[in-house]
Regions:
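Juxtamembrane/disordered regions of integral membrane proteins
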Residues: 1-161
Length: 161
């Protein structure tokens, strides 16, 4: 019975971590796009915050939907291999974002393909890295701990060098 509780708790950490990673990636992407287009400079602060409060969760839903399969593959590999370093999750977030860009390429009906724009592609990859680091902060630091009951789940101490 205790093992079932451990598995359910780990699953809850994974779901919460994925949701917060999508929100973090969305916030980062929104900030990059707003700064690149110079939005928010002429608007009062409540107007700019109001648009962010609406667009960040909406874009987070889109990110969570479109990046689900590559991210779940990375999370599953991280859990099975016990990957706990932030670099693994940052790089797999970038790879998941690159896969999303690959699926987006050529799907524009208006003639202007955002996925072909290198600046937009780099912004999406950077937001994928940011989301991967956010996932690591919530759930990645204890990846694989459910498989090895004696393994330490905290961060390592100082090296002493």
């Amino acid at each position: 019975m205790a093992a079932v509780f451990v598995y359910l708790l780990r699953f809850l950490f994974i779901v919460i971590g994925y949701a917060l990673a999508a929100l973090a990636a969305s916030l980062f992407l929104n900030l990059l796009v707003m700064s690149a287009v110079d939005l928010g400079h002429d608007e009062p602060l409540p107007v700019a915050l109001g648009s962010m409060l609406f667009s960040v969760p909406l874009v987070a839903l889109w990110i969570a939907y479109i990046a689900f399969f590559p991210a779940m593959l990375a999370i599953l590999l991280g859990e099975m291999l016990g990957k706990r370093d932030w670099l693994y999750y940052a790089l797999t977030g970038a790879v998941a974002a690159a896969i999303v860009i690959g699926f987006m390429t050529g799907t524009s009906e208006t003639g202007h393909d955002l996925a072909a724009d290198p600046g937009f592609a780099l912004a999406v990859i950077a937001s994928g890295m940011f989301g991967g680091i956010a996932y690591w902060l919530v759930a990645g630091r204890s990846a694989g701990a459910w498989r090895q009951p004696g393994r330490e789940t905290t961060l390592p101490g100082p090296s002493g060098s």
